[in-house]
UniProtKB/Swiss-Prot annotation:
UniProt KW Oxidoreductase keyword: no
Intracellular or extracellular location(s): Cytoplasm
Protein encoded by which gene: leuS
Motif 'HIGH' region mapped to chain: 40-51
Similarity comment text for this entry: Belongs to the class-I aminoacyl-tRNA synthetase family.
Protein source organism: Chlamydia muridarum (strain MoPn / Nigg)
E.C. code: 6.1.1.4
Record-given protein name: Leucine--tRNA ligase
């Protein structure tokens, strides 16, 4: 029989859909397993090979766990709000909803063609009003707890896009989306008080089964620093400075303020006002990421003002520099160039004093003044001495600071969740009640923002201006919308109870499914999405509406998919099919020498691979197998279409083997042993997520198995069941062809038995007058008398009417009866 994936795959995809094979149930008699992909933004480009890696991995685990008897939740949805759809709407006039629905339909078809076992009954998009009704409700929980507030904030503002951008949406002073100039402005924004949960967010990391690199990124992002607040007296009052090194206090030779510091105008001398104002303006065009990047030179300007050193009373010059950020500590730092690399660069740039106060072995030196003395103390001893001194003299105190800033939550966009608040002229506001949700945006034709700091919603006066029946006052609806992060902060909870119209989730369903047992997605989400989701979850946990302190038990980041790119230096990339190899070098059609690299797949580099093309040529099962075989799940991997072809050839061989006339109802030990060993290896690989070695295990199995004169049917069935998680279509087909009922997962996961793994069973040949009459699987340790008795019983019909004149016995090999 010939293996034709185009017929097999469509057939079984239809079967799974009609039978609702993957519908999850809250079955209290079963152990639950919740496996989740980081759901995608439904872009127009659709599914790419990078998606395949993570999605195939979670699907293998989901299918395996179902076969093992778990109640499995494996859902998929759409992170569908966002800037790209809105920008497309501005360019074309197409409503973002229309674009999004079209893209989702395309994405769904592609996912179906890969045979992913999602519970389609739980599907939703974050832009569905039925979903964002609850996003709005959860925002109001944060508001009621004082965790959502409005404040004037220094933000990244893009005039061309007309909206505020996060630091991650800005690169080298330009927006990632569109490449437009970005500037710093003070705008009134909604902010979430994530800093109130800094300690919980830090502490919770220790209990998570996450990559250590991700946990460290979050620790660094939160940036807990233990130190001291030091008060430096100026002509205009006390200047508070935070330091993690109070032991170096005597080594201070200058102070540096962030350009946004509220005392800048007050402290700046008349002679320096023009140059300081110019510097502050220049800083506004830089993102915070640019400002704190490691550079060999530092910029800054002297204010003309001085502060008194709290110990020596010496005058300390006060400077302004963009490497100091207002959101960390107090927005002011003390410059100790002898013991801080950034301070050293700054001091060298502006010829400021460098005073060494700590020896190479960490002991304080040159740190005496009157009754103040640190000399000879270790770093920790000196820190405590200084803190005691500061507190005793009302010059400061011990302090803990965080790099983490409150989360800027406003966006001046149309395609996002409207913030459910009404504002009044007296400055007060009213959060909407549950029966007023969802707050829907109005239908509009022009998606461009309305002036600085105002989104497109501000244009629709009949929507903005309302008479509030609750307060009997005229009010205005909030015209800012939530960021794309809002919907993805809690979507994993909605999957527990996706279509509940009375609550975001039912308590008993959340308690059954949470936490997520396995969460797979890209490392680019290591901080923001994962940190924001943990923040919301911990708020909910503190409020008593979720049962677990953390949302994601185990996290795995899949590696990047690389592909060969071909570039004409100084010109650009060409398609791979246009490049040709000559004498070990790659040449363009016009004869130019090409720069050949392995780079991340992208449209711009022309090195992407369309999954549909691969599926049409090789079949989804072959693509799935190669997606895992290409390399360890968490490592970068080089894609090769030849590798997919190799997996297709393997599936051809496997299909031929399983449908061969050599498949017999005979449990030959060699065949059973190969099958049991295969099952054990595949089981171990899936449990350890070493999914790249599964394919090689199958290849080794079939190479040995086809050497057998007979293929034991039980062994073939075991191999087919073990193949099902990674190549489900061919496995379902073969399972039926072997005489079983449809639905291979119902057969359960095959169990590897020790006797077949440890070599304690051997297969012996039983002959009569030298002719093969039977095979027996017996214990390796069986004595001769026992083996002969079993052999005689197995060939009794051939011995009838004759007399056994001689019995030839070869240990663990054969018994031959001569009659």
């Amino acid at each position: 029989m010939r293996y034709d994936p185009s017929l097999i795959e469509e057939k079984w995809q239809k079967f799974w859909k009609e039978e609702q094979t993957f519908r999850a149930e809250e079955d209290e008699t079963k152990t639950k397993y919740y496996v989740l992909d980081m759901f995608p933004y439904p872009s127009g480009a659709g599914l790419h090979v990078g998606h395949l890696i993570g999605y195939t991995a979670t699907d293998i685990v989901a299918r395996y766990k179902r076969a093992k008897g778990f109640s499995v939740l494996h859902p998929m949805g759409w992170d569908s709000f966002g800037l790209p759809a809105e920008q497309y709407a501005i360019r074309t006039g197409t409503h973002p909803r229309e674009t999004t629905e079209k893209n989702i339909a395309n994405f769904k078809q592609q996912l179906t063609s890969m045979g992913f076992s999602y519970d389609e009954s739980r599907e939703f998009a974050t832009s569905d009003p039925e979903y964002y009704k609850w996003t709005q409700k959860l925002f109001l929980i944060l508001y009621e707890k004082g965790l959502a507030y409005m404040a004037d904030m220094a933000v990244n503002y893009c005039p061309e896009l007309g909206t505020v951008l996060s630091n991650e949406e800005v690169e080298n002073g330009f927006s990632v989306e569109g490449g437009y100039p970005v500037e710093r402005r003070m705008l009134r924004q909604w902010v979430l008080r994530i800093t109130a949960f800094a300690d919980q967010l830090l502490g919770g990391l220790d209990e998570l089964d996450w990559p250590e690199s991700v946990k460290q990124l979050q620790r660094n992002w939160i940036g807990k620093s233990v130190g001291a607040s030091v008060h430096f007296e100026t002509e205009h009052g006390v200047l508070e400075v935070f330091t993690t090194r109070p032991d170096t206090l005597i080594g201070v030779s200058f102070l540096v303020l962030a350009p946004e510091h509220p005392l800048v105008d007050l402290l700046t001398s008349d002679e320096q006002k023009t140059i300081v104002a110019q510097y502050v303006k220049e800083t506004q065009s830089k993102s915070e990421r640019d400002r704190i990047s490691e550079m060999k030179t530092k910029s800054g300007v002297f204010t003309g003002a001085y502060a008194k050193h709290p110990v020596t009373q010496n005058p300390i010059p006060i400077w302004i520099a963009d490497y100091v950020l207002m959101g960390y500590g107090s927005g002011a730092v003390m410059g100790v160039p002898a013991h801080d690399d950034r301070d050293l660069l700054f001091a060298q740039q502006f010829d400021l004093p460098i005073i060494s106060v700590v020896s190479e072995d960490g002991v304080c030196i040159n740190s005496c003044h009157e009754d103040f003395s640190l000399d000879g103390l270790s770093g920790e001893e000196a820190k405590q001495y200084v803190i005691n001194f500061l507190e005793k003299n009302n010059l400061g105190s011990a302090k803990v600071a965080y790099k983490l800033r409150d989360w800027l939550f406003s966006r001046q966009r149309y395609w996002g969740e409207p913030i459910p608040v009404i504002h009044f002229e007296d400055g007060s506001c009213r959060p909407l009640k549950d029966d007023e949700l969802p707050l829907l945006p109005p239908e509009i034709q022009d998606y461009r923002p309305e002036g600085v700091g105002q989104g497109p919603l501000a244009k629709v006066k009949e929507w903005v201006n309302v008479f509030d029946s609750e307060t009997q006052k005229e009010g205005k609806r909030e015209t800012h919308t939530m960021p794309q992060w809002a919907g993805s902060c809690w979507y994993y909870l909605r999957f527990c109870d996706a279509h509940n119209s009375c609550a975001p989730w039912a308590e008993e369903k959340e308690q059954y499914w949470m936490p997520v047992d396995l969460y797979i997605g890209g490392a680019e989400h290591a901080v923001l999405h994962l940190l924001y989701a943990r923040f919301w979850h911990q708020v909910f946990y503190e409020a008593g509406i979720v049962s677990t302190p953390e949302p994601f038990k185990k996290l795995v980041n899949q590696g990047l998919v690389l592909s060969t790119s071909y570039r004409i230096p100084g010109k650009g990339y060409i398609a791979p099919e246009m490049a040709k190899e000559e004498n070990g070098q790659w040449i363009s059609p016009s004869g130019e020498l090409l720069d050949v690299r392995q780079e991340k797949m992208s449209k711009s580099k022309l090195n992407g691979v369309d999954p549909k093309v691969l599926i049409d040529e090789f079949g989804a099962d072959a693509v799935r197998m190669y997606a895992m075989f290409s390399g360890p799940l968490d490592k970068n991997k080089l894609w090769s279409n030849q590798g997919v072809a190799g997996c297709r050839r393997f599936l051809n061989r496997f299909y031929e083997m399983a449908t061969s006339s050599r498949v017999k109802d005979e449990d030959i030990f060699e065949g059973m042993s190969l099958a049991h060993k295969l099952v054990q290896r595949v089981t171990d690989d899936i449990e350890k997520l070493s999914l790249n070695t599964i394919t090689s295990s199958f290849m080794e199995f079939i190479n040995e198995f086809v050497k057998l004169p007979v293929y034991p049917k039980n062994a073939v069935e075991m191999a087919v069941r073990a193949l099902a998680p990674i190549a489900p279509h061919i496995s379902e087909e073969l399972w039926v062809l072997l005489g079983n009922a449809s639905g291979i997962e119902k057969a359960g996961w095959p169990k590897a038995l020790p006797e077949y793994l440890e070599g304690k069973i051997v297969t012996i040949v039983v002959q009569v007058n030298g002719k093969l009459r039977a095979r027996l699987d017996i214990s390796k340790d069986a004595i001769e008398e026992e083996v002969v008795a079993l052999a005689k019983e197995a060939v009794s019909k051939y011995l009838e009417g004759g007399v056994v004149r001689k019995t030839i016995f070869v240990l663990n090999r054969l018994v031959n009866f001569v009659i």
